[in-house]
Amino acid sequence: MNEKIAVIGGGQMGSQIAALAAMAGYKTNIYDENKENLEYRYKFVEENIKNLIHKKIYSEDKLNSYKENLGLNYSLEDVI
């Protein structure tokens, strides 16, 4: 896939939208000026994916796609 997605805002909704796009195979960049919040959300979503893998709802490739396709950005210029 050559499509790229930019999500502006890494709160609860933005982080979930970015995670779904990344798991679907899209190169996804998420921007938030609050570095601590964005890193917290990244780890929170990662743990949720691991729980869904444990429950056999997702396969391991979803976690790999999430990690490979999601970029965290703290500068708006880097996202667009």
What positions do the PLM features span?
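A structured beta-alpha segment of the ubiquitous adenosine-cofactor-binding alpha/beta core
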Residues: 51-80
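NAD(P)+-binding Rossmann beta1-loop-alpha1 motif at the extreme N-terminus of oxidoreductases
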Residues: 1-51, 55, 71
